[in-house]
Amino acid sequence: MGGKKAEQRIRGDYLDAALDNFSGYIAADELYDGPFCVLSIVDNRTFRRLTYEVLDHDPDHADIERFLRTFQASLQRRELLLQGITTDGSNLYPEPILQVFGNVPHQLCEFHVIKELTKAVLHAGAKVRRELAATRPKLSRGRPSSATARKAARQAKRIEQKVGDLFEHRYLFVQHVLTPAQRRTLLRVTRGRPELRTLRGIMDEVYRLFDRRCRTDTALEKLARLRGRVRRFKRIGKTLQKLFSPNLEKALTFLDDKLLPSTSNAVERGNRRHRKMQKTVYRVRTRSHIASRIALDMQREERATQRLLTTQALHCARGRAAA
């Protein structure tokens, strides 16, 4: 089946079959491809793309609202309800979602929020390294001859080693789970630098915010205490302003709904597959070609289970024939 026929089927039989098993939870995202933009909606529990639209310009609120209203109309025709929607931290979505779906729970992708926070923590660690390197004494040329010069040389070497260790093991400040050996390494490289140990403690508290065992209200109370702690952390607190972003509260919405996914991995996976397809399948990138290729990809994914069953049946038949 060609791309044009695949596009026609996606709007008809494919959507009917996909919505027969609709979970009620979706993920929405935009993919930029040169002058074009692909808007996608994916079932966030079955990981199945439901609909898409290819634009020849960067989307605005009107484009997003029109796209969502088209999908909402498809749900209403089938008497289906949307239970929750997950997006990234883009400003494109909050207003159109409110206009189209009302007060439906809107979850911001946990990974996108944590990514920004880990970048802030790493930036704070880099600031400490720069401050530490600035304390390195200036040495005269040649070998140190006096006792004072030798003492300064030893101090400079210790500082260089400390800065190097902090740079080499900087990932320990943001890694989610540390092994006992990694914790010992972290204690060693942060010896004499209490602000760095506080930095790691802040990151631990950030990860605890997303613990499914607590409710959103409890997580918000934890967040308020954490923000108070950061405000008192005068030395490098200014580099952690991401903790005060309103997106952080929106990323905790999933805690009140066990079925609401905390990430938009479902739609991100489809975007990655599209990027890979571009590199290996075709080079002509026009609006119509992109739309056709995505339709073919959706059709191929729909038939993946049937292909697997056919392959397994053939393998079993060959095995019996060989026996």
Regions found by a protein language model. Give the residues of each.
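Charged, low-complexity, helix-prone segments enriched in Lys/Glu/Asp/Gln
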Residues: 1-16, 117, 121-133, 159, ...
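RNase H-like nuclease fold core
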Residues: 1-103, 123, 266
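Generic secondary-structure boundary/loop-capping signal
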Residues: 28, 108-114, 257, 264, ...
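Acidic/histidine-rich catalytic cores and adjacent linkers
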Residues: 35, 76, 83, 87-95, ...
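Juxtamembrane helix-loop transition sites at the ends of transmembrane segments
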Residues: 50, 64, 131-136, 289, ...
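Short alpha-helix boundary/capping motifs
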Residues: 69, 125-129, 145, 299-302
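Conserved beta-strand -> loop -> alpha-helix junction used to position metal-binding or nucleic-acid-contacting
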Residues: 84-141
